[in-house]
């Protein structure tokens, strides 16, 4: 344990400096079995040439972001086969790297911490073909993870557009249909006391997992395992972004509007994959 502790200190900055993904672990058969449990799959709508860098906005957060995790840092749902030549990763909560051994699993999969420093490192590092997924709604959006609902926290999230402009990284919307369906969660409408309490916890700790219920190993109604319900990660067409070293607020806002429109179009075009009624639409807050 002493040697492990010393190694952790020496390697402390690894999650914010590109991590250290191991191909054999990312491609291990266990991830295919994991994907088959739900099942999970990726749908490609356009090519992502490896001569560009990409910031992939993943929606919705859900309870655990299972679709984004499986697509971006494992081979389980087929992302590497559909987009050859890309080096994919995902920005995840810094706390994922605070716990012994769990930290090493995250690093081995190539996950990086969600911070300005880590995103800048990835985009400034020489070479192209990086596909960096960010679950843009974060902990706030996780509180809206209810089956059959499609509520996103995105209106005020514009930093990703600024970085896309600054480094000339194309934006790609990705919607994980079914992400909100794998757990049942308690009602917590905006403005309710339950929601206010959850937001109070989130403001103190940075996270507040939704109060949820899944299934057990030997039953289908009570437990912490996710329900076996399909998740389909639809990867949209890239929005070409030209590099602007010092983008203006107007440029950021215009790119944000273009991204939101592309995301809504992606949802409307592919919602039939999960039999979502025609009168159900994406709500962006």
Where are these regions (language model features)?
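N-terminal membrane-anchoring alpha-helices
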Residues: 1-32
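Alpha-helical protein-protein interaction elements
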Residues: 2, 16, 22-23, 152, ...
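Soluble catalytic domains of membrane acyltransferases
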Residues: 26-234, 238-239, 245-247
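Eukaryotic basic, amphipathic alpha-helical target segments in cytosolic regions
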Residues: 42, 168, 243, 263, ...
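Structured cytosolic regulatory/catalytic domains appended to multi-pass membrane proteins
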Residues: 130-131, 138-141, 256, 260, ...
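Pol beta-like nucleotidyltransferase catalytic core
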Residues: 231-234, 250-267, 273
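C-terminal helix/juxtamembrane-tail motif
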Residues: 271-285
